[in-house]
Amino acid sequence: MRLIIVSGRSGSGKSTALNVLEDNGFYCIDNLPASLLPDLAQRALLHTELLQPQVAVSIDARNLPSQLQRFPELLQEVRDNHINCDVLYLDADDETLLKRFSETRRRHPLTTDTRSLAEAIGDESQLLGPIADLADLKLDTTSLNLYQLRDTIKLRLLNKPEPGTAFLVESFGFKRGMPVDADLVFDVRCLPNPYWKPELRDHSGLEPEVREYLAAQPDVEEMYQDIVGYLNKWLPRFAASNRSYVTVAIGCTGGHHRSVYLAERIGAALRDSLKNVQIRHRDLSS
């Protein structure tokens, strides 16, 4: 049996995440009282004829604060029964959440006559702290549209075939900010930039012209060898510490050339020694 617990601040994309999981064969329950989590997991484990072997539940700020405070012990009770359980925590920056609520005109569950939307969003972070602290995977949805979020959920959760550590090698551009969920960040802006070659500017690091140019640069090859050597040494230590997800981010200026090229090569190299390695290019379509 596999259990995914979805949480996060209101407006961060929890409903979308549950919809994706439901579309992919999960039995989904929204707004589960946290205190019922161990009982639900146990019943699902014992009565597979009633529930699918894949279950996803949403636990968020609609719960009583006292139940949210108990989340660590409730989660441990589930895991003591040897259930394959992942905690997904979604979030976005305050400005984005405010904008999303303004656009949809939906009411935040914590707003009252004396508590503004901005205050409710801030208070929600504290309420959900016990869940956020134990999240196996945190996703920042600030810059993701609906379709990108759906694709990210599929990549990170549904492409994880078995218990163990899922590794993601992600390219990005510093001009759009660093990925907040990255565990390791490598800055490759010091390398020769194909952008300044007019014939390469409109190509990406996935295309032969850019790949050939970068492969011929000694500094690029040296950077690649150093990063792969470091990761081959230390990523198995992350896996040994029972981490479910590890994100390695490779950043250049725009996220189109150098970081894309290196992320592809590094991801391919890591697949020789690690089981579950995925590659994603955050800014390639922008």
Swiss-Prot record:
Enumerate the Gene3D superfamilies for this protein.
P-loop containing nucleotide triphosphate hydrolases (3.40.50.300)
Q: Which UniProt keywords apply?
A: ATP-binding, GTP-binding, Nucleotide-binding
Q: Which terms in the Gene Ontology molecular function aspect does this entry carry?
A: ATP binding; GTP binding; molecular adaptor activity
In which residues is ATP bound? 8-15
> Which residues are GTP-binding?
60-63
The answer, when asked if ATP-binding is one of the entry's keywords, is yes
What family is this protein classified in?
A: Belongs to the RapZ-like family.
NCBIfam families found in the cross-reference section: PRK05416.1
Q: Per its database record, what is this protein's job?
A: Displays ATPase and GTPase activities.
HAMAP family, alphabetized: RapZ_like
- From the Swiss-Prot or TrEMBL record, give the protein name: Nucleotide-binding protein PA4465
